[in-house]
């Protein structure tokens, strides 16, 4: 089986309503399946929300009661992994027969993580926690470790996620290429014109399919209770999308789209990967391990280790 159809979902969550967002996600999964998709990618922080324009009312050297409450409200929208929400998503993946990458805000103890969840028709198959929150994201998200760099096997090759500006970390990309990634999923909150160029570069560099999804987010899709430092105009666009699919030779086969909520699809052929690797394999015949070598630590890093 070499040919398949991929989908990238461009949409926004329902503000302050996890149950409604899960329901919307399931409906979008069904819509992607109805359009013949075998694989679908959702944006970064789709479930739980990307706090675009928020700063939790923080100041250097001081926090405020208002900001603490904003964070508590935001945390309430995060999900446990695994949990009841992942069970619902797993059931939807099973019924649709889809392989999925979905961006969520994961709650683990007192810390939130920006996480990509992997689902197969058999259920929840793994996750990747964002290693490096960008800029002010560090106000609300913790740092993942190397233990969640796994990929998931599909009938069309291995699928994995690199989240937003992790894609600008050359060693992170190389680690994924070393795993033989075929379906390189890039959930993002970056809606700039330059993002499409980044996705094309990665497809060429890794000789893989790149599937990137970004939210189409307006102010009214953003929680009213959370202060927004960009705008309070309800129809103002905070994230304009830019969903895109690129083949292993860097050719754009769908998108980028900035028109609103949508699902883009493309028919792909995994035989394009060996054809592209004929003249370039970044971790194979085009590598120089005698000169350059990457060491990846995938051991979990726990703050408390108990030994008997």
UniProtKB/Swiss-Prot annotation:
Do you know which Gene3D superfamilies this protein is assigned to?
Answer: Carbon-nitrogen hydrolase
Q: Name one GO molecular function term.
A: nitrile hydratase activity
Reactions catalysed according to its record:
a nitrile + 2 H2O = a carboxylate + NH4(+)
Enzyme Commission (EC) number: 3.5.5.1
The record's InterPro entries line, in alphabetical order, gives:
C-N_Hydrolase, C-N_Hydrolase_sf, Nitrilase/CN_hydratase_CS, Nitrilases_CHs
Q: Name one GO biological process term.
A: detoxification of nitrogen compound
Keywords linked to the UniProt accession: Hydrolase, Plasmid
Task: Write down the Pfam families for this protein, in alphabetical order.
Answer: CN_hydrolase
Annotated CN hydrolase domain ranges read 4-270
Positions the record marks as coiled coil are none
Active site residues of this protein = 44 (proton acceptor), 130, 164 (nucleophile)
Q: Does the keyword Hydrolase apply?
A: yes
Q: Which family does it belong to?
A: Belongs to the carbon-nitrogen hydrolase superfamily. Nitrilase family.
Q: What does this protein do?
A: Nitrilase that hydrolyzes preferentially phenylacetonitrile, but not (R,S)-mandelonitrile. Also acts on dinitriles like phenylenediacetonitriles (PDAs) 1,2-PDA, 1,3-PDA, and 1,4-PDA, and cyanophenyl acetonitriles (CPAs) 2-CPA and 4-CPA, but with lower activities.
Protein name per Swiss-Prot or TrEMBL: Aliphatic nitrilase
Report the source organism: Sinorhizobium fredii (strain HH103)
Gene giving rise to this polypeptide: nit
């Amino acid at each position: 089986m070499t040919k398949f159809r991929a989908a990238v979902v461009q949409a926004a969550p329902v503000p302050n309503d996890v149950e409604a967002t899960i329901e919307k996600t399931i409906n979008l999964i069904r819509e992607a399946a109805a359009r013949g998709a075998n694989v679908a990618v959702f944006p970064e922080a789709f479930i739980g929300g990307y706090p675009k324009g928020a700063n939790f009312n923080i100041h250097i050297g001081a926090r405020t009661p208002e900001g603490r409450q904003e964070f508590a409200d935001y945390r309430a929208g995060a999900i446990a992994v695994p949990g009841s929400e992942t069970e619902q998503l797993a059931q939807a993946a099973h019924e649709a027969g889809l392989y999925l990458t979905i961006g969520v805000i994961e709650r683990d103890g007192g810390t939130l993580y920006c996480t990509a969840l992997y689902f197969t028709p058999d259920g929840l198959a793994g996750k990747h926690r964002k290693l490096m929150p960008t800029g002010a994201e560090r106000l609300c998200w913790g740092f993942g470790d190397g233990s969640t760099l796994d990929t998931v096997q599909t009938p069309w090759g291995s699928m994995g996620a690199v989240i937003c500006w992790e894609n600008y970390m050359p060693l992170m990309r190389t680690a994924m290429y070393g795993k033989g990634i075929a379906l390189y999923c890039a959930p993002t909150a970056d809606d700039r014109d330059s993002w499409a160029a980044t996705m094309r570069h990665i497809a060429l560099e890794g000789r893989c399919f790149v599937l990137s999804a970004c939210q189409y987010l307006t102010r009214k899709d953003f929680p009213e209770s959370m202060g927004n430092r960009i705008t309070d105009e309800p129809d103002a666009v905070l994230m304009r999308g830019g969903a895109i699919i690129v083949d292993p030779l860097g050719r754009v086969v769908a998108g980028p789209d900035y028109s609103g909520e949508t699902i883009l699809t493309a028919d792909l052929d995994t035989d394009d990967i060996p054809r592209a690797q004929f003249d370039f394999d970044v971790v194979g015949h085009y590598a120089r391990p005698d000169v350059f070598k990457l060491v990846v630590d995938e051991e979990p890093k726990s703050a408390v280790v108990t030994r008997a």
